[in-house]
């Protein structure tokens, strides 16, 4: 297979560089689809490096003002109705967040795949009419990660991650994420829409749409303080 001389790790690096930034600020819509109902949430998110992330829930109204914070290895949840900040136990990171198909880990943990996984080129395939490299990722022995294996489909032209499958430690399929609606976000061509489909659950999905993204806007570390959570506004 012709990869233009690129290794699997180099291809993965190019895909990661699409989101490489000192900071990312985004407006995000999350639609939860179930067989009998649909719910939409609006978020504002801020991240700095791999250790700091904040998410403010703008809607629906009953959840408005809820804030999530990841600061290094600690994760907190601010509840505006009771004006209380709660530290989340580590096991909550692997549980579904606010009824979505995303875990709290998916939402707030920003991990660099090239640090945590060994990459292997597995072939080529088409996704949404685009030719893609297929990259298989296996956790490094020392990596503290949730997944036993990931398979990524990365566009050969723009190095956009168009599909990802997530497998548990027994290598059973857990989730599939498909990227679409490629557009310019903050000066980068990216998949603005991500559809997460849990395995074995018919009619169930979570659709994440990035409405705006800003890269490299200066954010002070003090913004990601627990004491700042009640003051965060979108």
Task: Locate the predicted segments by residue.
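Flexible, processing/modification-adjacent segments and terminal tails
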Residues: 2-23, 29, 38-39, 67, ...
């Amino acid at each position: 297979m012709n990869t233009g001389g690129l290794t699997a790790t180099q291809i993965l690096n190019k895909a990661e560089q699409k989101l490489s930034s000192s900071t990312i600020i985004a407006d995000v819509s999350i639609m939860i689809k179930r067989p009998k109902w649909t719910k939409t949430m609006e978020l504002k998110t801020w991240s700095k490096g791999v250790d700091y992330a904040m998410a403010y829930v703008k809607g629906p109204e009953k959840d408005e003002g809820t804030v999530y914070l990841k600061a290094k290895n600690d994760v907190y949840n601010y509840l505006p109705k009771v004006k209380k900040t709660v530290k989340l136990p580590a096991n909550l990171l692997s549980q579904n967040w606010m009824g979505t198909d995303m875990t709290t880990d998916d939402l707030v943990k920003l991990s660099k795949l090239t640090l945590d996984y060994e990459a292997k080129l597995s072939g080529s395939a088409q996704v949404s009419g685009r030719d893609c490299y297929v990259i298989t990722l296996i956790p490094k022995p020392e990596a503290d990660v949730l997944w036993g294996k990931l398979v990524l489909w990365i566009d050969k032209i723009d190095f956009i991650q168009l599909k990802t499958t997530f497998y548990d430690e027994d290598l059973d399929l857990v989730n599939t994420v498909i990227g679409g609606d490629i557009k310019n976000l903050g000066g980068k061509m990216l998949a603005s829409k991500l559809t997460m489909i849990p395995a074995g659950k018919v009619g169930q999905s979570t659709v994440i749409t990035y409405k705006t993204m800003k890269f490299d806007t200066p954010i002070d570390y003090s913004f990601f303080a627990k004491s700042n959570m009640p003051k965060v506004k979108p």
